[in-house]
A protein has these predicted regions:
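Short, flexible loop segments at the rims of nucleotide/cofactor-binding pockets, characterized by
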Residues: 72-77, 100-104, 253-259, 356-358
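Charged, low-complexity amphipathic helices and coil/IDR segments
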Residues: 228-229
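PLD/PLD-like phosphodiesterase catalytic module centered on the HKD motif
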Residues: 1-71, 81-85, 93-98, 112-198, ...
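Alpha-helical transmembrane segments and their helix-helix packing motifs
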Residues: 74, 237-239
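Beta-propeller domains
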Residues: 239-306, 313
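Extended catalytic-interface subdomain
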Residues: 203, 214, 218-220, 232
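Structural motif
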Residues: 102-105, 128, 280-285, 310
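A short, well-structured juxtamembrane/interface segment
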Residues: 79-89, 258-266
Length: 469
């Protein structure tokens, strides 16, 4: 502001470098996420505009039908849905390609249509979901459609004793010498309307022959095992493959069920050796590695940010949702929730309880950990594994440990942080309402509020995100 009372150009910084928003991470890898933020302002205003309730959202914008709002469904599904449809379309359009998949749930009509279009060149190990009675089948309708279309279906009924919880796909070409794997797709996404659109999920596509061959070998073991964990399958699972080259990075590939919780030990070791910080998004994690992660946060002063749909461990009291100090309002970890009532111009989003009653039981369904993303050896853990004892010792699962790939780590870091930030605010509002506090009481016109940049949690946050600042 000049002496004349008008605005004038003053000192300014240089423009930041141009960035391109893309799923491509280089080295044949692309990372994909959906926009399943149902408890959000965007969806609250969408529902208000359409005159629908949270209970009606699933039928009108998620499940495929003649009346479904496909634009809303496409928005919620993001590049995750686009990529899953595209990989099936590529196989359907090329008679030389085949698709081999191991799936826990299959009920989304659009995805089932994609497999049906491939016909006999699609091979699927299909679980029976999470039934409570032996012999029941949550995927019965999809199984019938696939079989009628000539898809080669291998039944794998582990429930209710365990879950055949994989969601991986191997893409490859049929040659004179047999099936040649070329690509692998894995992640947290179940092939259901909620998996695509109303849960937060992720997927990773790797054009990588060695990894594709390893997942194909697992597919064959699962297909041959039927409804049990064969000795051959267990022996193979007990031999994780480490150090698979990926450009200048490496990948460790794990499958479960396995013996002795060696996968949990590996995850505990990873977070124990974190040097700067850890971000995570989880669905019903167990005690470990989360308990160790929280201990390391205190011992090493790590920057830790995370969201889980539900903390189920007996150590749940260790999860601090909100810090009491006004300057330390950041959550270390938060259970996903919505805005319970209108705050200013905010629209009512509904609550986590309403979500579970009308949409589904998973709000954040991703299973990912990012360790030291700005360090010399960033680590990403991603797959179907829920970081629990059941995932280790009972279920069919898979996960990758990607070491030293900065671009992949950045993709997962940004997604984890945006998820955390989204639910951090909602948890803060919920806490304020529960304690009858004004959520905006800490706002100040006094410039002294900036002093927090040099102390406490804000200082730790800035040093993590801007280590060169």
């Amino acid at each position: 502001m000049g002496a004349d009372g008008k605005l004038h150009d003053g000192p300014s910084s240089e423009w930041s470098r141009t960035l391109t928003l893309s799923a491509d991470c280089g080295d044949g890898v692309s990372v994909h996420f959906n926009r399943g933020y149902v408890l959000s302002q965007f969806m609250a205003r969408y529902m208000k505009r359409k005159g629908i309730t949270l209970a009606e959202l699933k039928e009108t914008a998620v499940i495929v039908s003649q009346e479904v709002d496909r634009e809303a469904r496409a928005f919620l599904g993001g590049t995750l849905r686009e990529t899953m449809l595209q990989m099936m379309a590529e196989v359907a359009d090329d008679d030389g390609l085949e698709l081999h998949a191991a799936l826990y749930e299959l009920s989304d009509e659009e995805l089932v249509d994609g497999l049906v279009a491939i016909g006999e060149r699609a091979h699927v190990v299909l679980a029976n979901g999470s039934v409570e009675v032996e012999g029941e089948d949550e995927n019965e309708e999809a199984r019938t459609r696939l079989t009628d279309a000539g898809v080669v279906v291998h039944d794998r009924f582990l429930a209710p004793k365990a879950l055949a919880h994989n969601k991986f796909v191997v893409l490859g070409r049929r040659t004179a010498g047999g099936f040649k794997p070329e690509k692998v797709w894995t992640g947290s996404t179940n092939w259901t309307p909620t998996g695509l659109c109303t849960q937060l999920n992720n997927g990773i596509m790797l054009i990588h022959e060695e990894l594709a061959e390893r997942f194909e070998a697992q597919f064959q073991l699962l297909a041959e095992a039927g409804d049990v964990v064969s000795d051959e399958l267990l022996a193979s699972n007990n031999r994780p493959k480490r150090g698979i080259p990926l450009g200048d990075a490496t990948v460790d590939s794990w499958f479960t069920k396995l013996s002795g919780e060696i996968d949990i030990e590996e995850l505990v070791d990873l977070v124990t050796n974190a040097k700067q910080g850890v971000l995570f998004v989880m669905f019903q994690p167990g005690n470990e590695p989360v308990r160790t992660l929280l201990r390391m946060q205190e011992e090493k002063d790590l920057y830790v940010r995370g969201v889980a749909t539900q903390f189920t461990s007996t150590g749940a009291e260790e999860f601090k949702l909100l810090k009491q100090n006004a300057e330390d309002f950041f959550l270390d970890s938060a259970q996903a929730t919505g805005v319970r009532k209108t705050v200013g111009e905010w629209a009512v989003e509904g609550t986590a309880a309403e979500f579970r009653a009308n949409i589904g039981h998973a709000i954040t369904h991703s299973k990912m950990i990012v360790i030291d993303p700005f360090g010399d050896d960033p680590i990403v853990v991603t797959g179907s594994h829920n970081f629990s004892k059941s995932a280790s010792g009972k279920n069919d699962e898979n996960f990758l440990v990607i070491r030293g790939h900065r671009e992949i780590a950045m993709h997962y870091t940004i997604n984890a942080m945006q998820t955390y930030s989204h639910y951090r605010w909602r948890a803060y509002l919920e806490e304020a309402a529960r304690e009858h506090r004004d959520p905006f009481q800490f706002l100040s016109r006094n410039p002294n509020w900036q002093r927090r940049r040099k102390t406490g949690e804000t200082k730790r946050m800035l040093s993590f995100w801007m280590p060169e600042g």
